[in-house]
C-alpha cells in the first residue's frame, strides 16, 4: 500500500501533467513546434525536480539551486525551438510557454497549487484570445 507521501507525489505529478496538457493542447491544435507531449514532459519534469529538491535534507544543501538549474535547462530547450525564417522569428511564444510551464511545474512540486492553476488559467487566457487578436491585426496590415 502507498504511503501518504507517495500518494501526494503521484497527485503532484498528475496535476502537473494535466496543467501541461491544457497548455500543450493549444499549441498542438495550432501545429506549433512543441506540442502537448513536450509541454507535459516539461511540467512533470519541473515538478519532479521540485519534489526532489524539497526532499533533500542537510545543512550544506541549497535547494534553490535545483530550481535555478531547471530554469537554465529550459532556456536551452527554448533556444532550440526558436528559429528565424526570412524576416520572421518563429517559436518564440512556444519557448516562452515552456519557460512558464517549468515555473508552473515547480509551483506544483512545492505545493503552490493555487498559484500553478491560476498561472495556467492566465496563460490560456493570453494564448487563445491572443491568437485571434493577432490574426485580426495581420489582416489589417
Across the structure, where does each feature detected by a protein language model lie?
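Alpha-helical transmembrane segments and their membrane-interface boundaries
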Residues: 1-66, 109-118, 128-141
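Alpha-helical transmembrane-segment detector that highlights a single hydrophobic TM helix
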Residues: 59-87
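Interhelical loops and loop-helix junctions of multi-pass membrane transporters/channels
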Residues: 63-67, 92-93, 97-99
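Alpha-helical transmembrane segments and their membrane-interface exit regions
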Residues: 73-78, 123-132
Amino acid at each position: 500500500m502507498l504511503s501518504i507521501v507517495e500518494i501526494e507525489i503521484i497527485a503532484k505529478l498528475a496535476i502537473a501533467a494535466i496543467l501541461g496538457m491544457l497548455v500543450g493542447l493549444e499549441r498542438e491544435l495550432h501545429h506549433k513546434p512543441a506540442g502537448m507531449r513536450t509541454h507535459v514532459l516539461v511540467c512533470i519534469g519541473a515538478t519532479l525536480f521540485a519534489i526532489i529538491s524539497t526532499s533533500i535534507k542537510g545543512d550544506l544543501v541549497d535547494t534553490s539551486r535545483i530550481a535555478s538549474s531547471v530554469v537554465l535547462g529550459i532556456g536551452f530547450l527554448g533556444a532550440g525551438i526558436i528559429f528565424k525564417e526570412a524576416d520572421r522569428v518563429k517559436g518564440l511564444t512556444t519557448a516562452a510557454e515552456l519557460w512558464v510551464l517549468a515555473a508552473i511545474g515547480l509551483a506544483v512540486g512545492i505545493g503552490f497549487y493555487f498559484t500553478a492553476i491560476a498561472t495556467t488559467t492566465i496563460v490560456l487566457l493570453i494564448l487563445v484570445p491572443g491568437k485571434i487578436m493577432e490574426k485580426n491585426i495581420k489582416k489589417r496590415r
